[in-house]
């Protein structure tokens, strides 16, 4: 399995699974999250409003990517309270991404540097 860590415009990356970090209580109205939500046809805010995802450690949302996106799936992982991310919580989030990719039989993962 190919795993890449990227900085910059993560939404333009190509892979089977795109991993995005989210923080507890995060405002989904930031420019980045609005863009992601637009690309994913409103699914991010819909799930957040339903309280299915709050950005807590261990929480995740797996969203099939729409046509035209260079990935098959987007995985949004919770990292907890912003500023409290530790090496261990980042490792757990990365592990969750790899486990998800294995379950889906995916060959490549790209994640933002968190």
Give the ranges of each region predicted by the language model:
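Glycine-/small-residue-enriched capping loops at alpha/beta junctions
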Residues: 1-114
